[in-house]
Amino acid sequence: MAVTLHTDVGDIKIELFCERTPKTCENFLALCASNYYNGCVFHRNIKGFMVQTGDPLGTGKGGTSIWGKKFEDEFSEYLKHSVRGVVSMANNGPNTNGSQFFITYGKQPHLDMKYTVFGKVIDGLETLDELEKLPVNEKTYRPLNDVHIKDITIHANPFAL
């Protein structure tokens, strides 16, 4: 399975690791299918680290899962924050996943086994480059100009056009 995030600065195609993180992918795909992420801003953007989105409030404090509550982490020794373009759930401690997620700008091994890796960017690294270049508020790391997820396309075949 794969999805394409259509953003204000371009598209990002993400392969999902449904076999290793079934609950996380079920949640993410259901939120995508219900247009939950449409209009969400990238509210946190730290050059060299990651960009975060998935909060419909746009504050970094909102968002929920399809079950209406936080859900457990799904860690795998095979899924690491080892390269640019890793997609993980954002959380505020163990087993507190909701709707927010982030995409890494590089290798981040200190995040392994703390944040559920559930996908990787397979196309659109140039869009990730554009996100990383955005000027941000130096205290909050929020982009000075909002960039949104416009909508999301779900692909059954991650290699389909």
Curated annotation (Swiss-Prot):
Catalytic activity: [protein]-peptidylproline (omega=180) = [protein]-peptidylproline (omega=0)
Keyword Isomerase belongs to the record: yes
Domain spans labelled PPIase cyclophilin-type: 1-154
GO BP, sorted A to Z: protein folding
S-S bridge residues: none
InterPro entries with a match to the protein in the record: Cyclophilin-like_dom_sf, Cyclophilin-type_PPIase, Cyclophilin-type_PPIase_CS, Cyclophilin-type_PPIase_dom, Cyclophilin_A-like
Molecular function as annotated in GO: peptidyl-prolyl cis-trans isomerase activity
Domain of life: Eukaryota
Keywords: Isomerase, Rotamase
Keyword Calcium: no
GO cellular component: catalytic step 2 spliceosome
PANTHER family in UniProt: PEPTIDYL-PROLYL CIS-TRANS ISOMERASE-LIKE 3, PEPTIDYL-PROLYL CIS-TRANS ISOMERASE-RELATED
Described purpose of this protein according to its UniProt entry: PPIases accelerate the folding of proteins. It catalyzes the cis-trans isomerization of proline imidic peptide bonds in oligopeptides.
Family listed: Belongs to the cyclophilin-type PPIase family. PPIL3 subfamily.
Protein name (record): Peptidyl-prolyl cis-trans isomerase-like 3
Organism whose genome encodes this protein: Gallus gallus
